[in-house]
């Protein structure tokens, strides 16, 4: 009897760390802009990716697309590097603004040629989402309407290639264009949900003196991907209100969360690890939002 008791106790002790590890397995992507200093200072990409995977990040969002390549690598090479490190390719920030000539003429067909090439490269890299990282405040309502039409067309082409297109906000989108319409609201209301989603950067919404949850309720289902960001390390400032954000993720339509650490109070490696640990330990952050 005593032997059986000891065996059971030993089995329970073995299960404790496994259970703890299981609790900390969450689908959390990282925006590679967060580690730009490491990459720009010459640290090999495969080393950076491996370290991120070992920390517990499960996928990446690229931030360095240029002329058919990601961080100097072909789409296939980049995809292989990410997967070899033990992560998945999720999304990429990529943009081409309209020229003054295109705005004046109302014809953005030339830019769409660029997008066709970019979409092909992103598809080859295994991307699920392409996100425009932001545009400036349009000078006129006509220009803003044109950008919505432009984004709808890009989104349609992404959809035809098995991807989705989104727009990432900052705080300036709360400005009114020609004193008529709030830029962010107008863009959400004048883009087709079938073609365009919004990657809400929760930090910039708060910095713009608005509530992410209010926007979730105002435009339910439009925020497929969230950028989880803070002033520096995630969770440190106390200003963003992550608890309420995550508890209302369902109404927002969230499928993925992407950590972005733009500023640091410690070395980059420590900063991105500390930010991830906050999300892994937070009871209000689910293991996955895509299921």
Segments predicted by a language model, with ranges:
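Bacterial N-terminal signal peptides
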Residues: 7-15
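Hydrophobic faces of well-ordered beta-strands that scaffold small-molecule active sites
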Residues: 26-31, 60-62, 89-94, 130-132, ...
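Active-site acidic/histidine proton-transfer and metal-coordination neighborhood
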Residues: 100-197, 269, 289
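Positively charged n-region of N-terminal signal peptides that target proteins for export
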Residues: 1-5
């Amino acid at each position: 009897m005593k032997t059986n008791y000891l065996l059971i106790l030993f089995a329970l002790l073995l299960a404790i760390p496994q259970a703890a590890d299981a609790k900390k397995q969450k689908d959390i992507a990282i925006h590679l802009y967060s580690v730009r200093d490491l990459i720009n200072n010459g640290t090999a990409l495969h080393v950076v990716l491996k370290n991120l995977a070992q920390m517990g990040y499960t996928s990446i969002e690229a931030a360095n697309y240029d002329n058919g390549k990601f961080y100097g690598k072909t789409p296939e090479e980049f995809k292989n590097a990410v997967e070899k490190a033990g992560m998945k390719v999720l999304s990429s920030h990529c943009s081409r603004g309209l020229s003054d000539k295109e705005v004046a003429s109302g014809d953005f067909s030339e830019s769409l040629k660029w997008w066709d090439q970019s979409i092909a490269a992103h598809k080859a890299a295994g991307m699920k989402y392409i996100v425009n990282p932001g545009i400036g405040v349009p000078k006129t309502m006509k220009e803003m309407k044109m950008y919505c039409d432009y984004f709808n067309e890009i989104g349609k082409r992404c959809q035809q290639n098995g991807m989705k297109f989104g727009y990432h906000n900052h705080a300036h989108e709360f400005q009114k264009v020609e004193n008529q319409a709030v830029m962010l609201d107008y863009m959400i209301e004048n883009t087709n949900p079938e073609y365009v989603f919004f990657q809400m950067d929760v930090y910039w919404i708060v910095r713009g003196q608005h509530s992410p949850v209010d926007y979730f309720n105002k435009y339910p289902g439009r925020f497929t991907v969230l950028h989880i960001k803070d002033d520096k390390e995630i969770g440190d400032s106390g200003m963003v209100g992550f608890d309420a954000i995550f508890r209302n993720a369902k109404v927002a339509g969230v499928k993925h969360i992407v950590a972005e650490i733009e500023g640091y109070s410690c070395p980059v490696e420590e900063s991105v690890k500390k930010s991830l640990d906050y999300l892994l330990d937070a009871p209000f952050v689910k293991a996955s939002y895509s299921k």
